[in-house]
Every structure is written in structure tokens, then in C-alpha cells.
Regions:
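Short, amphipathic alpha-helical "recognition" segments used to contact nucleic acids or chromatin
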Residues: 1-14, 52-59
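Basic, flexible linker segments flanking DNA-binding modules
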Residues: 21, 28-131, 229, 286-296
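Mobile genetic element proteins and their domesticated derivatives, centered on retroelements
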Residues: 21, 31, 51, 69, ...
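RNase H-like polynucleotidyl transferase catalytic core
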Residues: 102-108, 193-200, 214-233, 248-256, ...
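An active-site-proximal beta-strand-loop segment
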Residues: 125-164, 170
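Active-site beta-loop-alpha junctions of metal-dependent nucleic acid enzymes
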Residues: 144, 148, 166-189
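C-terminal domain-tail junction helix/linker
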Residues: 214, 240-302
Length: 302
């Protein structure tokens, strides 16, 4: 259609229109409809602009897929924008080139101590929690820096996917897991009685970690026999999202020092992840927003 309009100066020569339509197998009616429609504004332009605004709010938002973009639009309710179905949101994202496709996933790094005493699997892959600080998962991951590897350990609350304990060091000893637990207990003293689930890595079966578990009155849970990764899938998926959103195709970590890595990871979890990131498992609510709503509902009920 664009070729015909160019050759005929927008339809000024009827003879040329007939010839080009016949050669290119285009009907004259279709061509004239194109002339009427081509200068009209795209009906999804306000929606496209709103989505681009969402992507620029945070550097990690450019990893939003169709679901989180739809949830972000639903939460924010941009002015003068009619929010269509999730499928239409995806089509518009494809049209303007902002659709996100999942990248690689990290592998687990902890190794089991086959001789150590194991704890029972209390969660049995049920990661749903009705209340905060009842079910938590913990794990660690590694990131290569220019000087040495950085090991990141975290505890996630299954209720809202928030990070309630975080610690980083250049070793993956049991002391790192203990520090993570201590940080969580300091920030949330009511964690006493909660279940904290981990894999069967030697850090979590160590005497040092078990003593910390007992000190804070926490119930320890571990993957079932065989160390199947799906038994701690919730935590593995958290690391995958962090690396996809923060690191992959964004930073060359092997050119960064471990101190620099600590800074961006700490900021990512404590500021972005907990307070601003659209979380699909929370129906789009950032973790701390869901938590605030929960406690607000308890006050209203009282």
C-alpha cells in the first residue's frame, strides 16, 4: 500500500493506481481504505506511552513480561488510558518492541553433607502462607567479581515474597547462613516459631546453623531425601529473577569488585524488590505493600 501511494502521489493518478493494484494483487477498495486510515493516530498509542513510562520508573522494570506489565497498568491506572486484556497488552508490547523473553537460570551451589543429620521436610513443596513469618525459604547463590566470588544468602517470606534477611560475603561458610538468620531475627523478632526451609547443603546441616535455629525458636525444614531442587523451587526462582532483572545483560560482574556488587544487590533487594517491584504471586502488589495491607486489615477487624 505504501509503495502504491508513493508511486501515485497519494492517488492523484487513477491509471497508475489500477496498474499497481493489479500487479501487487491489492484491491482498489483496500488501497483507498489504507489512504483513509494511514494518517489516523494509533488507538493504542496512549497505552504504549503508559507502558514505556512504567519501564523508565526503575532500571529493572525492563524485564517486565506481559503479566507484570498488565498488573502494573492495573495498579497505576494511568490517566486517559483504557486498559485492555492481558493478551492485547502483550500484542502492543510486541508491536513497540518491549516484550521480554526469559533468559538463563542459575544453578544451585550448596553441596550436601551426606553424613550430617537432616531435618524433616515440613513444607512438602507447599509454599503458600496465609500469614507473614510462618513459612520462609532460604538459600544462597554466587556471583563472580573481578577479585573473587561473592556469595549472597537470603531468607524470603513465602507470604509476600519479601526478603526478610540478607547477608553477603566472599565465602560460603555456615557463618554466612547464620548471619542471614540473625539479620532476619533482628528485623522481625516475631519470626520465632516460623518454618525456615532450605536445601540439604552442609551449611544448613552444620552445628553452627542449627544452634542459631534453636536460639531463635525456629522450625528447620529441609528438602526431602535425594535433594530434589523442586523441593526448594520457590527460593531458586527468586535467585533466577534477581540475576535476570539485575545482572544479566546489564552488568559485567567480572569487571566489578565484590564491594560494588554488594552495593547494587543490597539496593535491589531492600529498595526495589521489597517496595516497588510488581510481584505476580501477590497479584501485582510489591511485597511490603501486601504486608501493610494485611496488618491494616487486622486493625480494621479489631
Amino acid at each position: 500500500m505504501k509503495f502504491i501511494a508513493l508511486k501515485t502521489k497519494d492517488g492523484s493518478s487513477k491509471g497508475n493506481i489500477t496498474f499497481f493494484c493489479r500487479v501487487l494483487h491489492v484491491s482498489r477498495q483496500g488501497y483507498y481504505q489504507y489512504l483513509v486510515m494511514k494518517d489516523r493516530p494509533w488507538k493504542y498509542q496512549p497505552l504504549a506511552d503508559a507502558m514505556k513510562d512504567i519501564l523508565t520508573e526503575d532500571i529493572c522494570n525492563d524485564t517486565y513480561g506481559r503479566t507484570r506489565m498488565y498488573q502494573a497498568l492495573t495498579m497505576k491506572q494511568p490517566k486517559n488510558v483504557d486498559i485492555p486484556s492481558e493478551r492485547t497488552v502483550y500484542r502492543v508490547m510486541e508491536e513497540i518492541g518491549i516484550s521480554h523473553h526469559p533468559r538463563r537460570k542459575p544453578n544451585g551451589i550448596t553441596k550436601a553433607d551426606r553424613e550430617a543429620r537432616k531435618s524433616e521436610d515440613l513444607l512438602k513443596r507447599d509454599f503458600h502462607a496465609e500469614e507473614p513469618l510462618t513459612k520462609c525459604v532460604t538459600d544462597m547463590t554466587e556471583i563472580k567479581g573481578c577479585d573473587e566470588k561473592l556469595y549472597v544468602s537470603a531468607i524470603f517470606d513465602c507470604f509476600d515474597s519479601s526478603v526478610i534477611g540478607l547477608a553477603m560475603d566472599t565465602n560460603m561458610k555456615a557463618s554466612l547462613c547464620k548471619e542471614t538468620l540473625e539479620n532476619a531475627a533482628k528485623a522481625y523478632p516475631s519470626i520465632r516459631g516460623a518454618i525456615i526451609h532450605s536445601d540439604r547443603g552442609m551449611q544448613y546441616t552444620s552445628q553452627l546453623y542449627r544452634e542459631a535455629i534453636q536460639k531463635y525458636g525456629i522450625q528447620q525444614s529441609m528438602n526431602s531425601a535425594g535433594g530434589r531442587c523442586h523441593d526448594n523451587a520457590r527460593c531458586e526462582s527468586m535467585w533466577a529473577r534477581m540475576k535476570t532483572e539485575l545482572l544479566y545483560d546489564r552488568y559485567d560482574t567480572e569487571k566489578m569488585t565484590t564491594d560494588e556488587l554488594k552495593t547494587i544487590i543490597w539496593r535491589y533487594f531492600t529498595s526495589y524488590w521489597n517496595n516497588r517491584r510488581i510481584c505476580s504471586t501477590n497479584r501485582g502488589l510489591p511485597p511490603m505493600i501486601k504486608r501493610q495491607q494485611y496488618y491494616a486489615s487486622l486493625k480494621e477487624a479489631a
